[in-house]
From Swiss-Prot:
DNA-binding as UniProt keyword: no
Cofactor (UniProt): Zn(2+)
Domain of life per record: Eukaryota
GO molecular function, one term: metal ion binding
Keyword Transmembrane helix listed: no
Protein name listed in UniProt: Mitochondrial intermediate peptidase
Taxonomic source organism: Meyerozyma guilliermondii (strain ATCC 6260 / CBS 566 / DSM 6381 / JCM 1539 / NBRC 10279 / NRRL Y-324)
Length: 786
C-alpha cells in the first residue's frame, strides 16, 4: 500500500594509507582547469585503485587521523548497528513531538493551518530519513549485524507510519485546510499539490473505516510488508537444487564436455541411483546444458527445475496476493490493481490491459513482425523444422527450454558475426562514468565530480562518492554513492535522502540537521543522496597493487552492463534535477508508471553509436571504440530483442492477472485457497510464445511485490521514451537545446506536476495533457501524434 510518509521506489574495513607524494598529487588535481582533465579524473577514480586511494586518503588524511569518525552517508548517528536502532528511536520521539505540535497549532491559529502541510512533509522526512536508509542497509550492507538492526528498525518505523496513515485527526485537519480558500490562497501550488496527495493517501489507507476495521487494516498492511521482505529474500531459492535425469538420457548426450562435467558432480549429489544421474542447479553447468545439450528431454527437465521456486516461496506469494485483495476490498475497490492504478497515468487496469494486448497483437500479427522473424530464425535451427510451417506451428514448436539452445546454434552458424574483438576492453567502469559526465555536461551543463569519503561514510572500501554539480548555477545538486562491486545485490537504485527546503522559519535548526544530512552551499536545503549498487566483477587493479604490478586491468563491462549503468543513472539524475521545496514529491517520487521514463530514456543514449562511439576508449591504449566493432556487437546482442519485449509484456500481463478481480471474487465466495500457479499456467497457455505451463517461475518474479500491478510501467515508459527520443534527441543526442527542453518539461518537476502535462510540453502535443484514452492510444502508437 502507498503511504503518506514513504514513497519507496528504491565488508571490507576502510584501510587508510599515507601516499608518498600526497601534496604533489593534490596540487595536480587542484590545477584542473578544463573539462577534459576532469573527465579523465573521473575515469581514473573508478579504474585505477591506487589513484583512487591516493585521491581519497591524501586529501583527507589530516581530517581522518585527527577528526571524529562519521557515519553512513555522513549521518553521524549511523556509526554502528546499535546507532541505527538508537537513531530510529530518536526520530520516533521527534516525530511524535512534531505531531502534537502541528495538531495543537493548527487547531489554535491560522498560522498553524498555513504551516500544516509543510509540517506534514517534515514529519514524512523524519521517518523517511530512517526507513529509507534502513531499507538500503537490509538489502545492500555486507555486515549481518547491520542488516538485522535495519530489519528491526524498518519494522518499527513502518508500523508507526501505518498508524499515522490512519490518524483521523491528522486527516480531518488537512481536509479542512484544503477546503478553506482563505488558507489555500496563502499556500504555494506545490504545497497544495502535496496536501492533495497526502489527503489521497489518507483516504486510500482506510481513514473512513470504523476504528476496529482500521486496526485490522494497519495489521494487514504490516503483514504484507513482512511477507514482501520474505518473498524478496527467497527469490533465488529453488524447489530442489539437483535435477534428476535417467542414465539413458545421460548416455544420449552427444557433448563430451557436458557429460564429463555432469559426471564430475555425481559424488557430491545428496542422492544416488543406479538408473539416474543428478545435475546440480547451482553454478554454470545448468546454463551450459540449456545452451549446448541437443537432448531436448534433458534441457526440458533442467529448465523446469531451474525455474521452480520453493514451495514456501509460492505460499508466501499466494498469501500476500490474498491480503492485497482483502485490503482493496476493505477500501471498496474492485481489485488491488484498481486501487494501485487509480491515480497513475494509466488510471485503471482496463487501460493497462488494452495497452498490453495491443502491443502483443502488433508483435504477433503485425506486418513485418520482428517477433515472428526472430522465431522463424530459431525454428530454422530446430529439429522440428518443416518447410512451409505456419506461424502457429512455429510458435507451438519452440518451447522455453529451446530458446537458449537454438539461439546458441544460430549465433554459432552466423560466423560472420564472430566477435573476435573484445568490446569490453573499450568499456571500463571509469570510461563509462567519465562518458556519462561528458554527456550530462553537454545536455544539462552538469558534471559528476569525485569527492573523498570520510572514515565510516561508506559501507565498503570500494564505494565511490560523487558530487553532482550544476555548472550554470555553480551549485551542488546532490551526492551519489556508487558501489559497482557488491557481491550479492542486483543492480539497484536507492533513495537515501530526498531534497527538501529546511523549515527554518518554523524552528528547524541547521546545527541539528547538519550532523544528519548534507546541506547545500546556503545551508537552506538538504541535498538528495542516492546509492547505486551493482554486482560487476572486480578488475585486477586491487590484486595488482598488492602484487607489486605496475599495470592493472580495471572492471570491464558488457554492453548490457553499460545499459544498466545508464539506466540507473537516469533515476539518479531525476533525483538530482527534480529538487522541490517539499520532499514528498521530489525526484523519483512521482507516479510509478512515469518514474521509469528517465531511466529507460537513458538506454536510448547507451544504444546510440554517436554516444558510445564518442566516449568508449580502450582502457590501456585510449583508442576510441571503432564503429564497425560496436555495430557488430550491437547486432549480435539484439538477435532476440523483440522476443524479450514480448516476454516482458507477458510478465506485465501476469502482474495484472494476479492483482486483478478474480482473486477478490474468490474471497467473496469464501475461497481462501489462492492458486497463483494455476493462474500463471493458464495465462501462459493463452499467450503461447515460449509458453511455460510446467514451472513455478512466477515465484521468482520480484516485481510482483515491489511493483504490484504497475510492472507494465517499463513497457509504457519505453513507449513514451521512444517518442521523446524521436522528438528531442534523435537528430543530436548531445544537444544542449534538447537536454534543456527535457529537463524543463520532465525532470525538474519531480512529482509536483501531472505527468501528462509534462509530456504535452516535451512533445509539443497538448492532446496529451488530457491524459484520456486518446492520450493512451497516442503513446501506444494506435493513433498518429497530432
Amino acid at each position: 500500500m502507498s503511504s503518506i510518509l514513504l514513497r519507496s521506489y528504491r565488508h571490507h574495513a576502510k584501510v587508510w594509507t599515507r601516499p608518498s607524494s600526497k601534496s604533489s598529487f593534490i596540487r595536480s588535481l587542484a590545477s584542473r582547469s578544463n573539462p577534459t582533465s576532469s573527465f579523465e579524473h573521473v575515469r581514473r577514480v573508478f579504474d585505477d585503485d591506487k589513484y583512487y586511494q591516493d585521491f581519497n586518503n591524501g586529501t583527507l588524511s589530516r581530517k581522518i587521523f585527527s577528526g571524529p569518525r562519521t557515519g553512513l552517508f555522513k549521518n553521524e548517528k549511523l556509526t554502528t548497528p546499535q546507532g541505527l536502532i538508537d537513531f530510529s528511536g530518536q526520530c520516533l520521539t521527534e516525530a511524535q513531538t512534531l505531531v502534537d505540535t502541528m495538531i495543537r497549532e493548527a487547531e489554535t491559529s491560522d498560522q498553524g493551518k498555513i504551516h500544516y502541510i509543510r509540517r506534514l512533509d517534515q514529519l514524512s522526512d523524519i521517518l523517511c530519513r530512517v526507513i529509507d536508509v534502513a531499507e538500503f542497509i537490509r538489502v545492500a550492507h555486507p555486515n549481518s549485524k547491520w542488516t538485522h538492526a535495519a530489519q528491526q528498525t524498518h519494522e518499527l518505523m513502518f508500523e508507526y507510519m501505518n498508524q499515522l496513515n490512519t490518524n483521523v485527526q491528522l486527516h480531518t485537519i488537512l481536509g479542512n485546510i484544503l477546503a478553506d480558500k482563505s488558507i489555500t490562497s496563502k499556500l504555494s501550488s506545490e504545497e497544495i499539490m502535496v496536501g492533495e496527495y497526502l489527503k489521497q493517501d489518507f483516504e486510500r489507507s482506510g481513514i473512513y473505516m470504523e476504528p476496529h476495521t482500521r486496526e485490522n487494516f494497519v495489521a494487514l498492511t504490516q503483514e504484507i510488508s513482512v511477507l514482501g521482505s520474505h518473498f524478496n529474500n527467497g527469490i533465488h531459492e529453488l524447489k530442489d537444487y539437483w535435477c534428476e535425469i535417467s542414465q539413458q538420457e545421460y548416455e544420449a548426450i552427444d557433448n563430451a564436455d557436458l557429460k564429463r562435467e555432469i559426471r564430475r558432480f555425481q559424488q557430491k549429489s545428496p542422492r544416488s541411483s543406479r538408473n539416474s544421474v543428478y545435475i546440480p542447479l547451482a553454478g554454470s553447468l545448468p546454463y551450459s546444458i540449456l545452451q549446448r545439450c541437443s537432448m531436448e528431454s534433458v534441457r526440458r527437465k533442467v529448465w523446469i527445475a531451474l525455474h521452480n521456486a520453493s514451495e514456501e516461496q509460492i505460499s508466501t506469494l499466494n498469501l500476500f496476493l490474498k491480503y492485497r485483495a482483502t485490503l482493496s476490498k476493505m477500501l471498496g475497490y474492485e481489485s488491488f490493481a484498481h486501487y494501485q492504478l487509480e491515480h497513475k497515468m494509466a488510471k485503471n487496469p482496463e487501460n493497462v490491459l488494452t495497452f498490453l494486448e495491443n502491443l502483443q497483437r502488433k508483435m504477433v500479427d503485425g506486418e513485418n513482425s520482428g517477433l515472428i522473424s526472430e522465431l522463424e530464425s530459431l525454428y530454422a535451427m530446430s529439429n522440428h523444422w518443416k518447410p512451409g510451417a505456419s506461424k502457429s506451428d512455429i510458435i507451438h514448436a519452440i518451447q522455453p527450454w529451446d530458446r537458449d539452445y537454438l539461439l546458441h546454434k544460430l549465433q554459432e552458424e552466423k560466423k560472420e558475426t564472430q566477435l573476435d574483438d573484445n568490446i569490453s576492453e573499450y568499456l571500463s567502469v571509469g570510461t563509462i562514468m567519465s562518458g556519462l559526465s561528458q554527456l550530462f555536461h553537454s545536455i544539462y551543463s552538469i558534471e559528476l565530480l569525485p569527492e573523498p569519503s570520510a572514515s565510516g561514510e561508506t559501507w565498503a572500501s570500494q564505494v565511490r562518492k560523487i558530487k553532482v554539480f550544476d555548472n550554470e548555477t555553480q551549485s551542488t545538486l546532490g551526492f551519489l554513492y556508487l558501489d559497482f562491486w557488491s557481491p550479492n545485490v542486483l543492480p539497484s537504485h536507492f533513495t537515501i535522502v530526498c531534497s527538501r527546503q529546511l523549515n527554518k522559519d518554523l524552528g528547524e535548526k541547521v546545527e541539528v540537521m547538519k550532523p544528519l544530512v548534507q546541506l547545500d552551499e546556503t545551508e537552506s536545503h538538504q541535498l538528495p543522496v542516492i546509492s547505486l549498487v551493482c554486482n560487476f566483477h572486480q578488475g585486477n587493479s586491487f590484486i595488482g597493487r598488492f602484487a607489486g604490478l605496475e599495470t592493472s586491468k580495471p572492471t570491464l563491462l558488457t554492453l548490457d552492463q553499460v545499459d544498466t549503468i545508464f539506466h540507473e543513472m537516469g533515476h539518479a539524475m531525476h533525483s538530482m534535477i527534480g529538487r522541490t521545496k517539499l520532499q514528498n514529491l521530489s525526484g523519483t517520487r512521482c507516479s510509478t508508471d512515469f518514474v521509469e521514463l528517465p531511466s529507460v530514456l537513458m538506454e536510448s543514449f547507451s544504444k546510440d553509436p554517436r554516444v558510445l562511439g564518442r566516449i568508449a576508449r580502450h582502457y590501456s591504449t585510449n583508442e576510441l571504440l571503432p564503429h564497425d566493432i560496436l555495430a557488430k556487437h550491437q547486432h549480435y546482442r539484439n538477435v532476440l530483442e523483440n522476443s524479450e519485449t514480448y516476454m516482458q509484456s507477458k510478465m506485465a500481463m501476469l502482474d495484472q492477472v494476479l492483482h486483478g478481480k478474480s482473486i477478490v471474487k474468490q474471497l467473496e465466495m469464501a475461497r481462501d485457497d489462492i492458486d497463483s500457479t494455476t493462474m500463471y499456467h493458464s495465462l501462459e497457455k493463452e499467450l503461447k510464445v515460449f509458453s511455460d505451463q510446467w514451472s513455478t517461475w512466477h515465484g521468482k518474479f520480484p516485481h510482483l511485490f515491489s511493483y504490484g500491478a504497475v510492472y507494465f510501467s517499463y513497457l509504457f515508459d519505453r513507449a513514451i521514451a521512444e517518442k521523446i527520443w524521436k522528438s528531442l534527441f534523435q537528430n543530436d543526442p548531445w544537444s544542449r537545446e534538447a537536454g534543456t527542453t527535457y529537463k524543463e518539461a520532465i525532470l525538474k518537476w519531480g512529482g509536483t506536476r501531472d505527468p501528462w502535462h509534462c509530456l504535452a510540453d516535451a512533445l509539443s502535443n497538448q492532446e496529451l495533457s488530457k491524459g484520456d484514452e486518446k492520450a493512451m492510444r497516442i503513446i501506444g502508437g494506435e493513433t498518429k501524434d497530432l
